[in-house]
Design a protein with these regions (language model features):
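Interdomain hinge/linker segments and adjacent boundary elements that couple functional modules
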Residues: 1-87, 155-158, 165-192
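C-terminal regulatory/effector modules of DNA-binding transcriptional regulators
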Residues: 73, 80, 92-192
Length: 192
C-alpha cells in the first residue's frame, strides 16, 4: 500500500484495533477525510504526479473500510481535533464545507466520538504533535506519534501510557460531544 514507511506498520494495528484514540492538531485524520479533502492534502506532496496522488487518495479511502465493517466490529473511535483543523483552508471552501459536514455526520454514528479542543484551551500538550493510540483487546498497546519527519510506531508501555495521559488531558480540555457537533455545524456553514 502506498503509505509512508513510518506509518505502514500502524495500518495493521489499525485494522485489528478494538478502539482508536486519535488527536490531531493540524489536519482532519485520514480515516475521517473525504476524497476531496484527502486529494487537497496529498497534492501538497512535492514531486507527486496526479496518478500517484490518486493512488494515495484511493488507499486512504480504502483504509476507511475499518469504520464500516461488521465482522469483526468496527473499532470504537475517539477523536480530538484542535479547533484550528476545522478552520484551516487546506482546500477550496466547498471541499472544506463538505469535509466538516462529513465530520458532523460521523459524529452522529454509534461508536464514534469527535470532540473539538477549542482555541480557549490555550497552550497544551497536543500542540507538540498528533498521535494515535490503538487498543487491541482490552489493553492500549500501540501508539503512532507523528512528527515533521513522518513519525514512529511504538509498543513501549511507558510511551503508550504517556500518550494515554496526554489524550485524557486533552479530552478534559475538549468541548462536550454535543457542543463539538454544534461548533462543527457552525464552521460548515461558515465555509459556504
Amino acid at each position: 500500500m502506498p503509505f509512508p514507511a513510518s506509518f505502514r506498520p500502524f495500518t495493521v494495528y489499525e485494522a485489528e484495533a478494538t478502539a482508536l484514540r486519535w488527536y490531531e492538531h493540524s489536519l482532519v485524520p485520514g480515516l475521517l477525510q473525504t476524497g476531496g479533502y484527502a486529494r487537497a492534502v496529498l497534492s501538497t506532496r512535492p514531486n507527486s504526479t496526479e496518478d500517484e496522488i490518486e493512488e494515495l487518495v484511493a488507499a486512504r479511502m480504502a483504509r476507511q473500510e475499518v469504520l464500516v465493517r461488521e465482522d469483526p466490529p468496527s473499532p470504537l473511535l475517539y477523536v480530538l481535533l484542535d479547533e484550528g483543523v476545522l478552520h484551516r483552508p487546506v482546500a477550496m471552501p466547498e471541499v472544506m464545507r463538505d469535509q466538516v459536514t462529513h465530520l458532523v455526520g460521523l459524529s452522529q454514528r454509534h461508536g464514534v466520538t469527535i470532540q473539538v479542543v477549542p482555541y480557549t484551551a490555550g497552550g497544551h500538550s497536543g500542540l507538540l504533535g498528533a498521535f494515535i493510540i490503538a487498543e487491541i483487546g482490552d489493553v492500549p498497546g500501540i501508539v503512532f506519534i507523528e512528527d515533521a519527519c513522518g513519525g514512529r510506531v511504538s509498543e513501549d508501555a511507558a510511551l503508550v501510557s504517556q500518550a494515554m495521559r496526554n489524550f485524557d488531558d486533552l479530552r478534559s480540555e475538549a468541548l462536550q460531544r454535543g457542543v463539538s457537533r454544534d461548533v462543527m455545524e457552525k464552521v460548515a456553514e461558515e465555509w459556504t
